[in-house]
A protein has these predicted regions:
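Bacterial Sec-dependent N-terminal signal peptides
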Residues: 1-27
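N-terminal beta-rich core of secreted/periplasmic extracellular enzymes
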Residues: 24-158
Length: 158
């Protein structure tokens, strides 16, 4: 009798562990479940967003002020962290740009390797430090080539 009880308890514990393991692998919320249709995920995400978060997705601040380079690494700037906290911005424009307007140069701007690190650092910060973890939309203007260090710029007609 005692042997049956022990086996039953062991089986129950194992099944609980297996169920817990599967539960950890599945997204907890609908909008994060990649197996569901996009329309379902979008509707779920929009229903969870506050008005402030929805407006924040429409903001498009200048991105070249949103990172700091330290040695050979890139980190979100305090200005970026405050922007995300206060305004819930969902987009940055010209993060990788380097020209006289941005005051980014070969020594202060992002080369291709640092640009990758910057994009990853900014995305990681937003995903890990916002309520819903919505990734940033990083936009660049490139009508005649991308104005970034290590990029090709093509001549344009006057």
């Amino acid at each position: 009798m005692l042997n049956r009880i022990c086996k039953s308890l062991l089986f129950t514990a194992m099944m609980t562990g297996v169920a817990y393991s599967f539960a950890q692998q599945l997204p907890a919320v609908t909008y994060k479940n990649p197996t569901l249709p996009v329309e379902t995920r979008v509707a779920d995400l929009l229903s969870r967003m506050t008005l402030e978060e929805k407006v924040g997705q429409l903001l498009c601040p200048l991105g070249w002020e949103m990172y700091e380079i330290k040695r050979n690494d890139v980190f979100p700037s305090d200005k970026f962290k405050q922007l995300i906290k206060d305004r819930k911005a969902g987009m940055l424009w010209a993060t990788y740009r380097a020209d006289p307007w941005t005051k980014k140069t070969l020594s202060t701007g992002l080369n291709p390797a640092l640009a990758t690190k910057a994009g990853n650092a900014l995305q990681r910060y937003v995903i890990e430090n916002t309520r819903l973890g919505i990734p940033l939309f990083l936009a660049e203007e490139a009508p005649h080539g991308h104005m970034a260090i290590g990029a090709t710029v093509f001549p344009t007609g006057i």
